Regions:
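Gram-negative outer-membrane beta-barrel domains
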Residues: 20-217
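Cleavable N-terminal export/targeting peptides
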Residues: 1-28
Length: 217
């Protein structure tokens, strides 16, 4: 996770030094597409039939793509605003198996979305810094003798840069973190399956670095 954070800071610093022109044209509705290097960390515990509690932490990294649609103000003043919606298609699945197939389960997270607002500080007519606050969601699907814990909900905080590239294009770099609400799943109690007194809880967190290319209409 420390290596990912170091890489994210380096990416943002490099793009923050980029120069371009015609930033005064960069305002209005935009569309962008990009990719992120993402690290996922999950703290959780397992409470079994005997009341024994096991705690643990797992982590994983991935590269994912996304697209976004939004609106930003121009750089005619020293401050501005960026409003938008991000969609991250795809899915990630975790499987848990045992000697008894009746207790095998899988947990899938897919199609992440985010609504965000980002106040901007316009450093020059070509570049801006911003702080972003977002509301994030993701679909959750489970299979096996376990109840669905419900979809993931969380909040995102990030900082980044916007640098114009020609009259209608721009490059966005961003580093941020998302904290999701705690989720909890219990067994269904099917005969030979997972008992209703078995509970698993987890608190997912992500850290990411993003590069995106956008087009202002």
């Amino acid at each position: 996770m420390n290596n990912i954070k170091t890489m994210l800071c380096t990416i943002v610093a490099l793009f923050g030094l980029t120069t371009a022109t015609n930033a005064n044209m960069l305002n209005g509705v935009y569309f962008e597409i990009g990719g992120s290097a993402t690290g996922v960390e999950m703290d959780g515990n397992h409470n079994d039939n005997d009341g024994d509690v096991s705690n643990g932490t797992i982590g994983k990294t991935a590269v994912v793509g996304h697209y976004a649609l939004g609106y930003m103000t121009d750089r005619s003043s020293s401050v501005g605003i960026d409003l938008g919606y991000i969609m991250t298609p795809g899915e990630a699945k975790i499987n848990a198996t045992s000697d008894d197939s009746a207790t095998d389960v899988s947990f899938e997270v897919s199609d992440g979305t985010e609504y965000y607002i980002a106040p901007m500080i316009n450093i020059t007519e070509d570049a801006s810094l911003y702080f972003k606050y977002g509301w994030s969601e993701a679909d959750v699907t489970v299979t096996g003798d376990i109840n669905n814990p419900g979809d993931l909900d969380g909040t995102t905080v990030a900082f980044g840069t916007l640098v114009s590239w020609g009259s209608n294009l721009y490059i966005r770099t961003e580093a941020g973190m998302t904290d999701f609400d705690k989720i909890s799943a219990t067994g269904k109690g099917t005969t030979g399956g997972i008992g209703t007194d078995v509970t698993v809880t987890a608190t997912p967190k992500t850290a990411y670095g993003k590069i995106a290319l956008g087009y202002k209409f």
